[in-house]
């Protein structure tokens, strides 16, 4: 069997992407780490642990062998950000397109995912898919738009859009890979903060203010690293931020909500099968911002909460007591 597209990672998002990509009858190969997940997908057309609501299309084939993914022309990488290097390196990718669908910053190195991927697969053409997406809605065929940022420019975009676009899944072209990555990584951290506001029952005014001020932090950080303002105000930045900061369907938002209700980050994350990437991104992001002299008080507050260094109400009170200043400066 010949596969045009492969998806590496059978969590909720990876499975949803495989479901969307196979919606027109195309064959899609989906890699899962767990042998039981592979069996369930192939035999029962289900992925109970990660996307139980979906009846999976018959043209999805699951495998537990990374080597099966090596020669597929287009690979979508949907593994947790902290495992991207080891998984992509294990595939032994030689050329082809690699589309990064995980949002985060590598702990210990501070590298964005595209830099990690270039080291792990130096001959591959890298792109980033990012935007306002909930896995269950994509799997259900509801309309979705994303940014597809291509390091290879329009030539790569034309190749990938043919492979990825579907009637209900619309990718928009960009060549600002850095901007697309930063938007997704930072919004995960800000979603935790918005969840805290929900957990503390501070109201919609507070949430709207936090989204706006959080977006200012995203802009400051992104512009310092070379992102374009239009990218940050697009689907992969502001669009993703608004969605993720408004619903408990977001793993990061629900983590923050639990923190606001008094739970510890350690306890919440130990009880989950899925990953809230913002919890891993927050301390790395804060370190990078400090090193560049970038003010990100909301991100710093999230780190304080994740470390359990202060109660949620005290942390929020600290944000509210900061010196008054102008709204718009990005410095």
From Swiss-Prot:
Enzyme class: oxidoreductase
GO cellular component labels: cytosol
SUPFAM superfamilies registered for this protein in UniProt: 6-phosphogluconate dehydrogenase C-terminal domain-like (SSF48179), NAD(P)-binding Rossmann-fold domains (SSF51735)
Localization annotation: Cytoplasm
GO terms under biological process: carbohydrate metabolic process; glycerol-3-phosphate biosynthetic process; glycerol-3-phosphate catabolic process; glycerophospholipid metabolic process; phospholipid biosynthetic process
Enzyme Commission code(s) on record: 1.1.1.94
Record keywords, A-Z: Cytoplasm, Lipid biosynthesis, Lipid metabolism, NAD, NADP, Nucleotide-binding, Oxidoreductase, Phospholipid biosynthesis, Phospholipid metabolism
GO MF, one annotated term: glycerol-3-phosphate dehydrogenase [NAD(P)+] activity
Database matches in InterPro entries: 6-PGluconate_DH-like_C_sf, 6PGD_dom2, G3P_DH_NAD-dep, G3P_DH_NAD-dep_C, G3P_DH_NAD-dep_N, NAD(P)-bd_dom_sf
Catalytic activity: sn-glycerol 3-phosphate + NAD(+) = dihydroxyacetone phosphate + NADH + H(+); sn-glycerol 3-phosphate + NADP(+) = dihydroxyacetone phosphate + NADPH + H(+)
Cross-referenced Pfam families: NAD_Gly3P_dh_C, NAD_Gly3P_dh_N
Pathway field: Membrane lipid metabolism; glycerophospholipid metabolism
Residues the record marks as active site: 187
UniProt: sn-glycerol 3-phosphate binding residues: 103, 131, 133, 187, 240, 250-252
Function statement: Catalyzes the reduction of the glycolytic intermediate dihydroxyacetone phosphate (DHAP) to sn-glycerol 3-phosphate (G3P), the key precursor for phospholipid synthesis.
Protein family: Belongs to the NAD-dependent glycerol-3-phosphate dehydrogenase family.
NCBIfam families referenced in this protein's UniProt entry, alphabetically: PRK00094.1-2 (NF000940), PRK00094.1-4 (NF000942)
PANTHER family found in the cross-reference section: GLYCEROL-3-PHOSPHATE DEHYDROGENASE, GLYCEROL-3-PHOSPHATE DEHYDROGENASE [NAD(+)] 2, CHLOROPLASTIC
This protein's name: Glycerol-3-phosphate dehydrogenase [NAD(P)+]
Lineage: Bacteria, Pseudomonadati, Pseudomonadota, Alphaproteobacteria, Sphingomonadales
Gene from which the chain derives: gpsA
């Amino acid at each position: 069997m010949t596969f045009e597209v492969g998806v590496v990672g059978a969590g909720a998002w990876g499975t949803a992407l495989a479901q969307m990509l196979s919606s027109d009858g195309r064959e899609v190969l989906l890699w899962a780490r767990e042998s039981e997940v592979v069996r369930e997908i192939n035999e029962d057309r289900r992925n109970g642990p990660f996307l139980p609501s979906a009846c999976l299309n018959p043209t999805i084939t699951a495998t537990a062998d990374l080597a099966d993914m090596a020669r597929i022309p287009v690979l979508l990488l949907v593994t947790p950000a902290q495992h991207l290097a080891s998984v992509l390196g294990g595939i032994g990718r030689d050329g082809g397109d690699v589309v990064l669908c995980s949002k985060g910053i590598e702990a210990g190195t501070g590298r964005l995912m595209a830099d990690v991927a270039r080291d792990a697969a130096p001959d591959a053409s890298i792109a980033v898919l990012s935007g306002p997406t909930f896995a269950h809605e994509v799997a259900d065929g509801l309309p979705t738009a994303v940014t597809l940022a291509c390091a290879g420019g329009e030539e790569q975009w034309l190749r990938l859009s043919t492979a990825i676009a579907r009637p209900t899944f619309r990718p928009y072209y960009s060549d600002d890979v850095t901007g697309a990555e930063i938007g997704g990584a930072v919004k995960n951290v800000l979603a935790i903060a918005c969840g805290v506001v929900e957990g503390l029952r501070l109201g919609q005014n507070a949430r709207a203010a936090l989204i706006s001020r959080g977006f200012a932090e995203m802009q400051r950080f992104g512009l310092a690293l070379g992102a374009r303002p239009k990218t940050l105000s697009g689907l992969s930045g502001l669009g993703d931020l608004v969605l993720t900061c408004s619903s408990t369907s977001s793993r990061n938002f629900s983590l923050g909500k639990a923190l606001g209700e008094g739970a510890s980050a350690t306890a919440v994350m130990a009880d989950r099968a899925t990953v809230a990437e913002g919890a891993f991104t927050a301390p790395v992001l804060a370190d990078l911002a400090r090193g560049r002299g970038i003010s990100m008080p909301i991100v710093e507050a999230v780190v304080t909460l994740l470390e359990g260094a202060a109660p949620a109400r005290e942390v929020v009170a600290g944000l509210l007591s900061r010196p008054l200043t102008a709204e718009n400066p990005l410095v």
